[in-house]
């Protein structure tokens, strides 16, 4: 982001309210946001501004911002309708204290925020994952103030999108893309070493039909870490929260379902070391967590 960016209290509130132009009770929402910012204080606002300027400049890890996280959780109180929940919380007990890569389908720019909020609401086991969540994010996440602000609710690692799903890397030659991808993977392994839980969207891009697309083979590179576990997750509902082609948020009932964790070593053995086969197994595990009309390539 530009080094000239600076949002004071009123400018930050105004920017957040643009997400919500089609909501009811705007005065109540504004008051809730203002109270959260005032409670955090000027130093927290200054920290947020510093992170907005610095985040996304290179292919590396960026830390979360506590104020951005709290503000999004207040917004979630208004956006997520009754029935929005995390299913399969019991599976989280198996990954406590272990390196884990959560692999999910992808419907919306709001998917990672949904996962973070639902985990934070899911008792001690959920909070333990939410508090160490780091999301693998493509360049578009850092391309606008709105998306960048949303990305500060958790750690992120900027990564180039696969050439199979993106034209964004056209200005980079193949060697540059490979170097950037290597930096991102190294950063991810460092975060796993430090105890983070990685969240990766297996298809590499949002589905425009809500049906699953074939997963990307390159995702297996995140599994190349000692004793790592793979946790499949299925998301529904967010395609209506932040529809493709629209800027505003819509209230929705959204659900994330967690499946049984898979030891990456066992996944590798089951696939005979074939990385494409590994990701098709993971894709099928995600599809099992989704309604039939979301399964697409893994029906």
Where are these regions (language model features)?
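Membrane-anchoring hydrophobic helices of lipid-metabolizing enzymes
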Residues: 1-101, 106-124, 128-130, 141, ...
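A conditional alpha-helix N-cap/helix-loop micro-motif detector
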Residues: 82-85, 177-182, 212-213
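Short, glycine/acidic-rich beta->alpha junctions
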Residues: 107, 111, 180, 211-217
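Short internal beta-strands
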Residues: 134-139
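A contiguous catalytic/ligand-binding core that recognizes phosphate-bearing ligands
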Residues: 143-146, 176-189
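A cross-family acyltransferase "interaction/gating" segment
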Residues: 148-151, 196-197, 202-272
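Surface-exposed cleft-lining segments at the edges of enzyme active sites
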Residues: 165-180, 208-209
